[in-house]
Amino acid sequence: YELQFGLFASMSYLSKFGYPNNIKDLQENHRICYRENYAGVWPQWKKIIDGARHVVATTNSSAMLLRMTCDGIGIGLHPIAIGKRERDLIHLSQLGIKISHPFWIVSHKDGQDEPKIKALIDHIREVTLQL
């Protein structure tokens, strides 16, 4: 399963700073909230961050990154399904950022057929397919 990521901004951020017109505008004129390990995972995102003038907040927590984006501190990169669940966030799909990340489950081979573990794995699989 591939988890899809996109850029999001809050309505309060967009009313104050406007929408970025393109990636260059994002880098030069907009505030970015950043999860520190994302650049090591996606070269496309690293290139954007390296060229950004205003990285205003950095965190190692997905929950904190989402909170900062919702609070209007800056634009953030989030799983699309998570960002779309937040009523105040707008997906900036017009920028054309298409980043995905593999999502997988690991279990010990001796336990994967136990009913409780199999039920949990099946449940996680069903939930992630809805993301």
Name each model-derived stretch.
Residues 1-103, 129-131:
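C-terminal regulatory
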Residues 95-131:
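A late-sequence structural motif
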